[in-house]
């Protein structure tokens, strides 16, 4: 056996209640496990118990027993734990210690005083396993998200650990790169027979390759330990607010009942013939949704080009319009130039060529401050935006910069906080809030300035499905009830499908397409160019022999929105 928890509990010293409660779990050598559950359920805490961070670096009270490779972890120091369990973190940048990829992989070997020649051979062999040999002399900080992930994997594999722990490895990756990461993890598992544990919100992406068991947690306890087929046939995912695979949701939307015998865990194994008549009937009976009429242009981007180094173009001749009241997505792979567009719109960067207009007014000579009177930007990580200790002061800061009277500020801030679901927190310190609540604070900071356009960079990154749904419902309400024009930058294809009608896709630093989402998502070759992937919704429609796949996608999304 690799891992055994016996009545194991853990409580952080700073918290009143335990984060892990009476965990009883056995993971056998060579198993591949997915660990899922809502944010704060104890997934990462359980992982930190495995790699020794708890209790050696993170203090708290433990009870019960944890055995790794038949050794009681109470008797082991941190070095011993990390020699058995290798961890790949969600934030790969925080894991790098070398100036080059080769140095980073070799770090653990240097600490063990391995001879130089032997070290080179081990680094070379490890780099081969994750396809890094061509970039061993590159800085890890200059790599793409997928390459960084592989460097982190190599850094823990070089130690020849028995257990590989991946903590949300897909959180920052575009769909195609995420699938490649899951394939690499699967190959490592098959080639080495190591025990693999994947902590992740994106269950459908994890199930891109076979999993032995899925462990589901809630409020510090294990509430399910099942095979993927058994779990997906059960109502547990829906009951506990965890997003199920799209094809499962679509089959259920047609009124079908799924059992474990239908092999639902993987699209390649599910018995689709059984469901085909009902799915076809549902599609032909459902009413086609009507699209909203297009309003006047609010933001116009014309022939925009930019280069960070004056040589290689980050954006090349990009043009698009955003209409008043629209909810639009900008999509593309990591490093395609999506975030650069935001910086150019806000004036943080100056375009090499091209013009940006807002309500017909050229923004070229407007300062960042002037642009911020009409355009709000919410960054992916709220901690990178928040600069005040108290919530009220944070939301009031923009109004104070404008010189507004304090009495007016109080009225506006309290109204905005109430709108954002933060009314009772206005005297709270920011540090007391959850990640999702902090995100709402950053949105409130923009909304109080009454912008015409709100741009959100990866608004749901790192959030579980419950908080994801709450955040997007709030953003959708701003769009529908206030008429606020919203642009989201995202590579979450489920999010874009469900909440936006139009997407602007950037690939190889150019505009690849600007079209309705259901049209884009029914074109595999186009998606592949942008490092995106077809959804299982497309695969289902194709397998059913449905001719108008874009209409099928549109009908399903309308059904999902109606039943939310």
Question: For each of these PLM feature ranges, what is it?
Answer:
Residues 51, 346:
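Helix-to-loop junction immediately C-terminal to a conserved catalytic motif
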Residues 59-71, 354-362:
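Conserved ABC transporter NBD signature motif
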Residues 117-135, 407-425:
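Conserved ABC ATPase "signature" region
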Residues 139-143, 147, 429-433:
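Conserved ABC ATPase signature
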Residues 160, 450:
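Conserved catalytic motifs of ABC-family nucleotide-binding domains
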Residues 164-167, 454-457:
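Catalytic Walker B motif of ABC-type/P-loop ATPase nucleotide-binding domains
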Residues 221-247, 510-537:
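Conserved beta-strand-loop-alpha-helix hinge in the C-terminal portion
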């Amino acid at each position: 056996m690799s891992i055994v928890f016996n009545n194991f509990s853990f409580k952080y010293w700073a918290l009143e209640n335990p984060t892990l409660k009476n965990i009883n779990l056995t993971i056998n050598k060579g198993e591949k496990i997915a660990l899922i559950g809502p944010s704060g359920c104890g997934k990462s805490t359980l992982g930190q118990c495995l790699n020794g961070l708890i209790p050696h670096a993170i203090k708290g009270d433990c009870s019960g027993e944890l055995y790794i490779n038949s050794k009681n972890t109470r008797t082991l120091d941190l070095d011993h734990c990390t020699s058995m369990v290798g961890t790949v973190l969600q934030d790969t940048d925080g894991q790098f210690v070398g100036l080059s990829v080769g140095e980073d992989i070799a770090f653990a070997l240097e600490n063990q005083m391995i001879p130089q020649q032997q070290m080179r051979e081990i680094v070379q062999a490890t780099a081969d396993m994750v396809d890094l040999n061509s970039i061993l002399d590159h800085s890890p900080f200059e790599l793409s998200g997928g390459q960084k992930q592989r460097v982190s994997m190599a850094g823990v594999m070089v130690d020849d650990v028995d257990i590989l722990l991946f903590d949300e490895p897909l959180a920052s990756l575009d769909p195609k790169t995420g699938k490649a990461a899951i394939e690499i993890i699967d190959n490592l598992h098959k080639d080495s027979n190591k025990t693999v544990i994947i902590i992740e919100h994106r269950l459908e992406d994890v199930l891109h390759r076979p999993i032995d068991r899925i462990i589901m947690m809630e409020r510090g306890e294990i509430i399910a330990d099942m095979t993927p087929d058994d779990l997906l046939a059960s109502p547990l995912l829906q009951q506990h607010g965890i997003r199920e695979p799209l094809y499962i949701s679509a089959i259920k939307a047609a009124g079908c009942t799924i059992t474990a015998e239908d092999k639902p865990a993987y699209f390649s194994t599910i018995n689709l013939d059984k469901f085909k008549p009902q799915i076809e009937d549902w599609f032909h009976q459902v009413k086609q949704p009507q699209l909203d009429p297009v309003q006047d242009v609010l933001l116009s981007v014309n022939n925009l080009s930019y280069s960070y180094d004056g040589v290689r173009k980050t954006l090349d001749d990009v043009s698009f319009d955003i209409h008043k009241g629209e909810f639009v997505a900008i999509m593309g792979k990591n490093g395609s130039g999506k975030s650069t567009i935001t910086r150019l719109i806000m004036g943080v960067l100056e375009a090499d060529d091209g013009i940006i207009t807002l309500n017909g007014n050229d923004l070229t000579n407007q300062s960042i401050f002037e642009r911020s009177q009409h355009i709000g930007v919410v960054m992916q990580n709220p901690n990178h935006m928040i600069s005040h200790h108290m919530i009220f002061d944070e939301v009031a800061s923009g109004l104070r910069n404008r010189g507004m009277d304090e009495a007016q500020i109080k009225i506006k801030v309290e109204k905005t906080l109430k709108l954002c679901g933060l009314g009772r927190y206005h005297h709270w310190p920011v540090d007391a809030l959850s990640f999702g609540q902090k995100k709402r604070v950053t949105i409130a900071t923009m909304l109080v300035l009454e912008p015409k356009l709100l741009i959100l960079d990866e608004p749901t990154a790192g959030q579980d499905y419950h908080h994801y749904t709450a955040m997007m419902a709030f953003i959708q309400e701003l769009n529908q009830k206030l008429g606020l024009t919203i642009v989201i930058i995202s590579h979450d294809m489920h999010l874009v499908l469900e909440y936006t009608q139009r997407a602007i896709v950037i690939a190889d630093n150019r505009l690849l397409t600007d079209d309705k989402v259901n049209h884009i998502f029914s074109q595999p070759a186009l998606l592949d160019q942008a490092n995106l992937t077809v959804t299982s919704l497309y695969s289902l429609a194709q397998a059913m022999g449905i001719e108008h796949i874009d209409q099928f996608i549109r009908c399903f999304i309308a059904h999902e929105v109606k039943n939310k």
